[in-house]
Amino acid sequence: MNLKGYTRIEGVFVPESITAGRQFETDYINVRLKENRVYTDAEVAELPKINTQHPHYKEWQIRRTSFKRLFSYLAAMPKALNILEIGCGNGWLSNSLAQLPNSTVAGSDINLNELQQAARVFKNTPNLRFFYIDDYKKIPGQERFDMILFAASIQYFPSIKQILNSCLPLLNTDGEIHISDTHIYRPSQVTAAKQRTYDYYNILGCTEMSGYYYHHTWDEFDSFNMTVLYNPGSLLQKLKGNSIFFDG
């Protein structure tokens, strides 16, 4: 498969010119190592299942429940789905969604290290591709999607309005945007949340990461047609045409 303006590097489609993201990638991998969130190929292949002794076992149980809810929702749709995951990391969720019958999945991120791991681990999934994308106004091939998913990733985008407005033209007529596993705040909560984030990264010795983390509030979605599907304090959001749904 050849895409104009993209080169395939270790299984990942990479634009011929990269305009942003490399410093974030370096800082992000550094903090992931300190958090014990860099997984071996063997571990990634099994996610969201993970050893009960792993320090993040309970977190992965929550992610597994969230995934099952999303998978059931999508499996009930009476059509083949073309899916884009934004912020796919090591690709476990993109690969899991690629198990939907007749689906096609594109996983994207600006973390080339994790993308290459994803391409390596899931190389035998024929309906799955991975892209390094730093500008979602420049999706390769003018492709359109039935679903765009942000799973624990929208907090790394500074503007909800900007990223969602960039994504809307990428949807098919009845397409949906989903946002999951991200906490959305009331305005009165933001100051304290920012301090907690700074304190957390300060303990890890990675205060630069606090500058990449954005504490979005519910009112940022006011210009969109949004529906909350599930909200135990976090969210999944589904955007259909101009509508959005949240599911934690």
Over which residues does each language-model region extend?
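A conserved beta-strand element that flanks and buttresses the S-adenosyl-L-methionine
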Residues: 149
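Conserved beta-strand signature within the Rossmann-like core of class I S-adenosyl-L-methionine
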Residues: 174-183
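A short, conserved alpha-helix within the catalytic core of class I
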Residues: 157-167
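Conserved alpha-helix/loop element of class I SAM-dependent methyltransferases that forms part
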Residues: 59-79
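Short alpha-helix
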Residues: 209-229
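N-terminal auxiliary segments of SAM/dcSAM-dependent transferases
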Residues: 1-38
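Conserved Class I S-adenosyl-L-methionine
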Residues: 191-213
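Class I SAM-dependent methyltransferase SAM/SAH-binding core
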Residues: 92-137
